[in-house]
Amino acid sequence: MICHSIVCGRFKLMAHLFCPPPKLHYLCRMKTVRPKKNLGQHFLTDLNIAKAIADTVDACPDIPVLEIGPGMGVLTQFLMEKDRLLKAVEIDSESVEWLNSHYPALRENIIGDDFLRMDLSRLFGGRQFVLTGNYPYDISSQIFFKMLDNKELIPCCTGMIQREVAQRIASAPGNKSYGILSVLIQAWYDVEYLFTVNENVFNPPPKVKSAVIRMTRNSTENLGCDETLFKRIVKTVFGQRRKMLRVSLRQIMGDKAVAPEFWQHECMTRRPEQLSVAEFVELTNLVDAALKSAV
């Protein structure tokens, strides 16, 4: 494939000759918005990767799309080609100004706000939507916890995050990467680790590799246990992940006098990374019953 270099100020970027002018225009404007370390901004500069990320939303057709942290719109421009209702949330006022100037067709749908503080039910009038973006590393886990809190609104979430976080989300039981995010997300979503992205396609380059994932709501409507207790147990036992459950669960059971059979259950000699989502549901029901019958 034939490529050529475009030199824009301090940045030397690669663009394919077949890229239409608007996309090359984006590259030559890279210097107009300064990436801000406090916001965890790493602007993607590879158009092929941007298009590949945009294409991941096709798995959930016919519903609106919400992009988080569009920056200067390298992903936005490809999402706009999807002919779907698109809104973008950007906390950086400089980026909002740039987006309004260069994407006038999207101006009414560019929201200058903090995604983590927003009421998502108001975004599309209560309609479901796809969540996507080149997510800031610093808050990616918080974004996914908010997704879980709004899972009935978000049947599909795609995008790019730190590779280590993506590996945790997609990890299976028995793997050292398996943890809180793995269990809580896999309880409600099917997870696909799509591809890895190298550091050199960002400005500034991050110190770690990135990855693109897709999470699609599974058929689970009810876990079959107390969901609040389920989350509490998952977070508690992974907080002491190297200890057996009979040790870490004492933080939840406290001084309550429970039946001896509870502590003799076969799962008590296992560690949290050895339990599947279904086994965590079973454990939650076991703990729930023990707490209710405790003296």
Predicted regions located by residue number:
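Catalytic cores of RNA-modifying enzymes
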Residues: H16-T236, K256, E273, A278-V295
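Primarily a LysM-type cell-wall glycan-binding module
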Residues: R241
